[in-house]
Amino acid sequence: MIGSINESPIEEHMNDSPSTKEKADSVDISDYIVSHSDDSLSKDIKKDTKSFLDVEHGEISTVDEFEEDSPYPEVRAAVPPTDDPSMPCNTIRMWTIGLIYSTVGAAVNMFFSLRNPTVTLSVLISELLAYPALQIWDLIFPDREFRIGRLKFNFKPGPFNVKEHALIVVMSSVSFGNAYSTDIILAQRVHYKQRFGFGYEICLTLATQLIGYGLAGLSRRLLVRPASMLWPVNLVQCTLIKTLHRKDLRNAVANGWRISPFRFFLYVFIASFIWNWFPSYIFQALSLFAWVTWIRPNSPTVNQIFGESTGISILPMTFDWNQISAYILSPLMAPADALMNILLGVILFFWIVTPALNFTNTWYGDYLPISSSGIIDHFGNSYNVTRILTKDATFDLDAYQNYSPIFMSTTYALAFGLSFASITSVIFHVILYHGKEIYDRLRDPPAPDIHEKLMKAYDEVPFYWYLSVFLAFFGMMMGTIYGWKTETPWWVIIVGVIFSAVWFIPIGIVQAITNIQLGLNVFTEFIVGYMYPGRPLAMMIFKTVGYITMTQGLAFAADLKFGHYMKLPPRIMFYTQMIATIWSCFVQIGVLDWALGNIDNVCQADQPDNYTCPNATVFFNSSVIWGVIGPKRMFSGKNTYTGLQYFWLAGVLGTILFWALWKKWPQKWWGQLNGPLIFGGTGYIPPATPVNYLAWSGIGLFFNYYLKKIFADWWQKYNFTLSAALDTGTQLSVIILFFCLQLPMVNFPDWWGNDGAFNTLDATGAAVRKLVNESAGEFFGPAEW
């Protein structure tokens, strides 16, 4: 599978099914706490990392001669308990390379997001390529101070260092992701024929991207500083920087393995780069190895049960790291209890509940695929949204009643229910499991860990800086909706921001511990559909403010934790995040406007170069369904999916039950059940299928439970290095394949592994047990709607 996932590809037609994820357990889980006294490799690593941050500068600031370290083995494996406050990082070198990378990444990702299939430059690729860029800079520029009047500067204030490298990673992180507002702009300009101009586009983008930054800064006491807020995604980035910069660390033997982390990274990187050519290009059947469907390719039941494209993946197999890590990142980053809870959720809801519903014809499952993210009419065809719109793109009730209600596959409908359950579950989970901890931390912060102690060497960003950012861009958002004819009242923005703020801490805690984020996308669409129906633009704006404010804010919080681990001065972090984000907004809007003005038939289904704007099309369809048709016609009264409303209550009751089991039997496996993860951890199904989650959780449990328990030294030395190597090798291979072969339409010679293996009902999306004869006037579903 060439390409990568931007937001949640789950936004297929009806847009997102629950883009969820999360977890949480008591922060004091014994699985995370490891005694220092018997951790020999940990001691070796402490000795080795003693010089990690002083490559260029003498002594390192430490506490108690390195005897103090993080209580979490994950952090000890990736982050040295050291710092050198004198290390320069606010340098011309850092700003130049960082802004170049931000510009290229934002422009490339924006441009190719308009194409199907797409390709995405990831932050890990930026992190990897920044290393040789910094080396080349040092070869070109002298270490010499220049003066212009009273201004002094140096292009090379010593050899490049880890802090400069880390700040470039931060700038890439905030600029590489496509702004959600660009989908609003595309929907307006292409489908609704509204063009408000560059001023509107840039104000909308800046406001929606940066309101969340204020929330991130205001939540530092709860989401960034506590040692228990691990943010596992950062540990891989820290490990990669450490691996690249310190090839000479003392090479302690780990369970018989003597190879250095750098050489280990290099070998795995090369192997994954080469291997990806097979499932992505040479032998694509390796990606979704649905071998049972090859035996019975035309059996709807076999393809529904064993299929891996539109089935429920019984006997799952994949040999493609893209399939394993594309939706919820590398499994080597997730804690074992999070992996187990998500695995339980997949088995319960998609191996037991889904076939039980589908094969009893619940929600007319006989006539629908068992797993698909499309919306379907009562003839079994893709739902034709244009048939229910007037010429000015407003809802035509008569046309709707003369056409068809909306139907969904069983997994898609169930995913909405699970999204409802996860929204209520996360609130009750955080109150029950973490409420006292939050209260105590706000009232009397606990003693800092070693990393927080080391950060005291730097001036903190004042509270009012973040508050000012929040208020400034909130004001810009208000000015945007009234400065242009958006038909969006002020209270829609306020309610959207309140939604983000209320769920920011609960979802942030879960994400910081488990690396799984629960999304508010479905919830915001659902609420605005009831609250302000018939206003598609208002729906899109509310969703962006209510959902992206939280998502973007949590991404900023994750970067703040990365800076915390890498001992980056907080005020320099503030400047780099703000400047890179603002600059990337201008870059993305510039690229978008250029593409709309210079690519013929852009965003049209017949565009010859495949610049069909798939995300924007899905976003438009979503605005019609939620903003025009509205959830009332799907989830209320006697409509087909009304029963899904009970999942709100299921999320509450399930979480209370799991909490009671935890209080009674905290050491038993049933005491570790986690409501938000069980209900919401599978939020990318569909378009993901169970094979993505089963392979992900299986590999994750092998490394983060079995190897961590049996071969702890090996795990601590190599686990995150392995994750970084697999990700970067695969992603770089995907990029080269895309630009060198896929973009110029150079296909591998036809053979069964790229052709015949996909001639199944599962692969073609046609695994349906019953069909209707539309020409004879047959249809399924209710007689009236």
Curated annotation (Swiss-Prot):
Annotated Basic and acidic residues bias: 10-26
Compartment list: Endoplasmic reticulum membrane
One Gene Ontology term from the biological process aspect of the record: tetrapeptide import across plasma membrane
A GO cellular component annotation in the UniProt record: endoplasmic reticulum membrane
The organism's place on the tree of life at top rank: Eukaryota
TM spans (from-to): 94-114, 121-141, 167-187, 196-216, 264-284, 339-359, 413-433, 461-481, 490-510, 512-532, 537-557, 572-592, 611-631, 642-662, 683-703, 732-752
Gene Ontology terms, MF aspect: oligopeptide transmembrane transporter activity; tetrapeptide transmembrane transporter activity
Assigned keywords, A-Z: Endoplasmic reticulum, Membrane, Peptide transport, Protein transport, Transmembrane, Transmembrane helix, Transport
Topology of this chain in the membrane: Multi-pass membrane protein
UniProt-annotated stretches for the region Disordered: 1-28
Annotated InterPro entries: Oligpept_transpt, OPT
NCBIfam families: ISP4_OPT, OPT_sfam
Family that this chain belongs to: Belongs to the oligopeptide OPT transporter family.
PANTHER family hit by this protein: ISP4 LIKE PROTEIN
Name the UniProt record assigns to this protein: Sexual differentiation process protein isp4
Phylogenetic placement of the source organism: Eukaryota, Fungi, Dikarya, Ascomycota, Taphrinomycotina
Gene: isp4
